[in-house]
């Protein structure tokens, strides 16, 4: 398995080099109708062993400054490509850092906070998700990627929300 090449219709591209590939993708496939971005949550997690929590314990009262470069790259991609819908997903600990750039999140689904432009997702209230489900061994170099999968139920909710969305243009 080289990277995530085993995932159908997946390309592994460097988000920091988006200027090198975004135009080719738009030419090949057209403007995407939807973009989902999930910057790595480690920097923003409130978990005890995460950098943010460690910083707070070691530097009480001092502001934590996470690396926002991936979020900025995603913002640039969305501004350049202008998809009809997009979601930027992260954990609750990202909220104080994302909100100044993206505004408030539009929906919270369990532990997922969603920012962007998308209809509200209809996810069953009894749905549950744990990042530890089918958790690969810690020696797996792709562990973080595999744990970061967007759950199928969320993906299905996005498809349904977008498919059933009626725009004002469609009424005219």
Where are these regions (language model features)?
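Conserved active-site and SAM-binding loop architecture
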Residues: 1-172
């Amino acid at each position: 398995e080289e990277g995530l090449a085993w995932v159908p219709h997946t390309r592994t591209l460097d988000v920091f080099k988006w200027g090198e590939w975004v135009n080719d993708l738009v030419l090949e496939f057209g403007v995407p109708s939807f973009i989902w971005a999930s910057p790595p949550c480690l920097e923003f997690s409130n978990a005890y062993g995460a950098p943010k929590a460690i910083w707070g314990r070691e530097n009480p009262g001092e502001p934590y400054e996470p690396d926002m470069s991936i979020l900025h790259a995603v913002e640039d991609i969305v501004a350049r490509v202008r998809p009809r819908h997009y979601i930027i997903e992260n954990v609750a600990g990202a909220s104080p850092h994302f909100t100044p750039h993206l505004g408030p999140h539009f929906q919270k689904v369990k532990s997922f906070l969603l920012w962007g432009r998308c209809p509200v997702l209809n996810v069953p209230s009894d749905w549950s998700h744990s990042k530890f489900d089918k958790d690969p061994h810690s020696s797996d170099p792709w562990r973080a990627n595999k744990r970061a999968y967007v759950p199928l139920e969320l993906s299905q909710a996005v498809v349904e929300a977008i498919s059933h969305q009626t725009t004002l243009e469609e009424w005219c």
